[in-house]
């Protein structure tokens, strides 16, 4: 029917998994036209960006997408160009978005583009864990307001080194729910990584605008205070860096300044922020330089003083460099605190509830047993989530927060 042929699509880079999915669809009388043996990170048939209301995936853990993996470089990353395939896709009415997607992939295959370069968080990288790229892939596939569910290792949710990923996703989708799975969930598949189910909803256009407005307001409220800290740090270090904390250098520089020639440390500048995640722009500090002009009648004296000052400064260059390094370290600490303050304020302005659960049983044992005899808290969990959804729809008033019951241990 229409649901199977026009609404359900699936892809897997493991041929056996793809065949099993196709057979399952056939056995349920749903056909299998949308199921493909293909790399899930690449478009195929009706699978392309911005098309789906719902995406579900369980990406492989412990593997990486490397820069050596190219579009069209293997059977599962091929880009079909045969006339029958093109005609079939056009007859299904995928329209301009599909045409543009297929054109991009053909260009990528012709130029042997690394798969990583198709993704913002992969572009220019030597490798990325597969599950991280799948987070971006799923969000790309969704329409604005579309929902996704993904199984992720818990390290993605709490490892400090992956804070950038969480912040990246936070700026593109709302976190709906996190369900921490018990350790035995994947033991029968020889997976030892603790995992969780993560549910996200891609921003609508209105939510994207609200997110950007929150950042604009946060910058308005926060930036000036941290700029003052940068100015104070500069004022504290500048004379010491310029003179290398040497008394003779300080004296000579003072005499030159009286004649109109100064040795100065330039004001700090804002650098270029990385593409992701959002953060305060890094502070850039240049090296000392000479500034000013000496009157003609003082040039001979100034030339001699400058020669002496230059020689003296050369002797304390290491100290000056060390002080400059200290100042840059201070700037880095200010930048990090600035970023933390921005994120804290944005999260206050763009605050919303998240459903979190940690069931002890999910219908599977450590040996892979399933069925009616295996305990599962998931039905009760679903009921609780429906209550949570209803509460959100009613305005999420604190006084009406659902009082979820303890899960049954039976």
Q: Across the structure, where does each feature detected by a protein language model lie?
A:
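Conserved SAM-binding loop of SAM-dependent methyltransferases across substrates and taxa
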Residues: 1-3
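Short alpha-helix immediately C-terminal to the canonical SAM-binding loop
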Residues: 16-20
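A conserved structural/catalytic subdomain of Rossmann-like adenosyl-cofactor enzymes
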Residues: 49-410
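Conserved SAM-binding motif I beta-strand of class I
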Residues: 8-12
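Residues at the starts of beta-strands that form the adenosine-phosphate
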Residues: 5-7, 147
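Conserved SAM-binding strand-loop segment of SAM-dependent methyltransferases
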Residues: 31-40
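Short loop/turn elements that flank and shape the SAM/SAH-binding pocket of Class I
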Residues: 41-45
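Conserved hydrophobic residues forming the short capping helix/wall of the S-adenosyl-L-methionine
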Residues: 25
